[in-house]
Amino acid sequence: MRRSTVRAAMKLTFLGAGAWGTALASHAAANHDVVLWGRDPAQLAAIAATGSNEAYLPGVPLSPRLRVEADFEQAVGHAADDPDGLVVVATPVSGLREMTRRLAGRGNGHVRMLWLCKGFEAGTHALPHQMVREELDAAGRTSGFDYGVLTGPSFAREVALGLPCALTVAGSVPTLADCAQAAFHHHAMRIYGSDDLTGVEVGGAVKNVLAIATGASDGLGLGLNARAALVTRGLAEMTRLGLALGGRAETFMGLAGVGDLILTATGDLSRNRKVGQQLAAGQSLDQILASLGHVAEGVRCAQAVAALAEACKIEMPITRAVCAVLFEGLSAADAVAQLLQRDARDE
């Protein structure tokens, strides 16, 4: 479906001043009235003073039109109180329930919310849209709250530098795609719509786990053939789980599936890939996470993906191998050896 992307300036609020939230906020600020909120007032003050987010995007200048706001209610009200506004939650998965709860509790005005996080919730193994729906039901918000996810192959630093990328938006209502395209589809960014919330979220979660596997393979010096095999067979694992959870096969052939997997599994800016490389070098998980300093979602959701695969009775041997290396003391080299010893079968 072709949609017009010519729109008047919108009001947007970003909740979360990490790398991705800051990069996308800076991109949107070129055309819109954008406010960025974060939990650390000192960090926000530094962004305002220097025009950059040195904690997450060092050396990258941000749009001079981007404004920061330390007061949560003031920041949310900027977009939520406008009938055409959009609130973008840029926290990790662990912060999504809190943000949804706080937005749902502001009254009965119409709210439009997108989130940027990828993964499953620890403990419940819920997808982000399931978490949001649970919070809205608990708050009695049966209408007037449109929600969705913006996802796809995108390194924050490249977006902040204005380099081209393409993303997918999937939402609870079709009009949310129009809203996201009006907000972000300009300059070097293209936004494509989808109605498969489950599929795009499964793709965004599983690719992080698979990127750890390809990073380990590369770290062991196993070559490009091995990398291609892991990406391809990993895509098969992603698709099997996605179908079992209610997603559609074609989604995994798009930006939120194979597109995001290729980027995260092969790009040197990928934190999850770096985890795999460092595991192959013999570092412990604690050492790796301390050196990264930022979230590597593949570590957080590997066990959830493996548990869901077991519950759905589907085979995900690469994912299972990643879990064994991360949490059970198996070396990366032994994990590869075990994968190579699996019985022959049809593709």
Swiss-Prot record:
Tree of life domain: Bacteria
PROSITE patterns registered for this protein in UniProt: NAD_G3PDH (PS00957)
Known pathway: Membrane lipid metabolism; glycerophospholipid metabolism
Keyword Nucleotide-binding recorded: yes
GO molecular function: glycerol-3-phosphate dehydrogenase [NAD(P)+] activity; NAD binding
Subcellular localization: Cytoplasm
EC number: 1.1.1.94
Function, as annotated: Catalyzes the reduction of the glycolytic intermediate dihydroxyacetone phosphate (DHAP) to sn-glycerol 3-phosphate (G3P), the key precursor for phospholipid synthesis.
Assigned protein family: Belongs to the NAD-dependent glycerol-3-phosphate dehydrogenase family.
Protein's name in the database: Glycerol-3-phosphate dehydrogenase [NAD(P)+]
Originating organism: Cupriavidus pinatubonensis (strain JMP 134 / LMG 1197) (Cupriavidus necator (strain JMP 134))
